[in-house]
Amino acid sequence: MPKNPSQYILALDLGTTGNRAILFNHQGEIAGQSYQELTQYYPHPGWLEHDAIEIWQDTCNIIKKVLKTTNIDITAIAAIGLTVQRETCLLWDKTTGKPLHNAIVWQDRRTSSLCHQLKTEGKSVEITQKTGLIIDPYFSATKLTWLLEWVKANNPSVALKNVLAGTIDAWILWNLTGGQVHATDHSNASRTMLMNLDTRSWDRDLMDLFGIPERIMPEIRPSLSYFGETDPQLFGAKIPITAIFGDQQAALFAHGCNRPGLLKCTYGTGSFLIIQAGTQVMRSHHQLLSTVAWSTENSAYYALEGAIFTSGAAIQWLRDGLKIINNAAETETLSRQVTDTKGVYFVPALSGLGAPHWDMNARGAFFGITGGVGREHLVRAVLEAIAYQVKEVVDAINLESTLKVAALKVDGGASQNDFLMQFQADALGVPIERPLILDATAQGAAFGAGLTVGFWDDYDSLIASRIIDKIFEPGEDREQVQANFIPWQRAVERAKNWVH
């Protein structure tokens, strides 16, 4: 019998393109869910913002909606687990509860010049040594610098003593607790470029370097711990919040990657590969990131990560930008209509290139277009590029580690695409394992929250109960797929350093 009499765990998965609430029962099954798409704001080329008020209002709405549609009372929820898009950050006024500017999203490149300046000043080695990260606009530090300077210039009446800073988890936690708790967890803090990976605390030297007062930053706590409880005025009850993860780390937790060498890839807006590295920080020699996987009151687990900025975002661009598809599912049908791309290669550098290149001046491109190329060839080239980017990172991981990648666990929206998953298996030459529940980020947050309050007793048995939907084995096209990787790499080299 479970120790906790409540019947459900509520997972909040606050992502880049939308926000989701999912209820999990004692069997680890989804009992209900609700979703709200999130507005994207592009004020200038290369800039991307979210309205933090919209994220908070959506969070309240999706919680109320999932409870209403399932006819479940709030008191039946044992705990809340929160997982969020990482690096996206904001400043807000604690006296008004209002953001001082839109949140700056992880894909935003507005701080490229500041990052370039830091590199020319020789700060790369120090920052990587302290944080495990590579100087890039992707991370929160330069975004917070920009926001503080913007507030000083445009809203000088705001007193710094009233300003709070944080990633999306800190903002939502602060609101859920009625402004009582200003905290984050180690997995999110490790993505700011401000947390020392060895001490797992804010690094004073880096705070000074980026001009960020430590007092405005949230307290860092273990991922699996008691963060506070919901303000009863919000939903009618006090519900404990007992796990916070960055979205990719939550997926790693859901896949049961709790031993060194276990690897997962989430195909979302970007693709994110994380390999569990154990309880010691593992330093990369191949442009991968060292990061916190998750932490408990007693220990911390680390990981190596390859962050790819554009995967699902490229499919969204085909739909909304080029308007050559009506929906994401169409990409599979179109790709199967042709046997190859007719020599077309796509470089998905719509927000620069992440791992293993880290080139903020790269730009997206199609190469090899001739008169006989149709939209199906372009669409197939985009899917192939998503898989080839993952291969680049897996190759880097294999160079890095004594633990060679023997299989890849996958999740996220694009992992529903059977063509892409088979192509991925052929490109890597290893099996691809797709679970029945693809919402691994929400599942990981739920597992963490439930284990913390004793809703579930044992992590291993929880993982063992997960159902595998399909395993994609490398097929007869494997040799051709791997041969085409070489000209694709040539295309990538041509797209790099495009903007001078």
Swiss-Prot record:
Stated role: Key enzyme in the regulation of glycerol uptake and metabolism. Catalyzes the phosphorylation of glycerol to yield sn-glycerol 3-phosphate.
Gene it is expressed from: glpK
Alphabetized Pfam families for the sequence: FGGY_C, FGGY_N
Family: Belongs to the FGGY kinase family.
Enzyme Commission code: 2.7.1.30
Classification via CDD domains: ASKHA_NBD_FGGY_GK (cd07769)
Residues annotated for sn-glycerol 3-phosphate binding in this entry: T16, R86, E87, Y138, D247
Activity regulation annotation text: Inhibited by fructose 1,6-bisphosphate (FBP).
Reaction(s) this enzyme catalyzes, per UniProt: glycerol + ATP = sn-glycerol 3-phosphate + ADP + H(+)
Name of the protein: Glycerol kinase
Matching HAMAP family: Glycerol_kin (MF_00186)
Chain residues that bind ATP: T16, T17, T269, G312, Q316, G413
Pathway noted in the entry: Polyol metabolism; glycerol degradation via glycerol kinase pathway; sn-glycerol 3-phosphate from glycerol: step 1/1
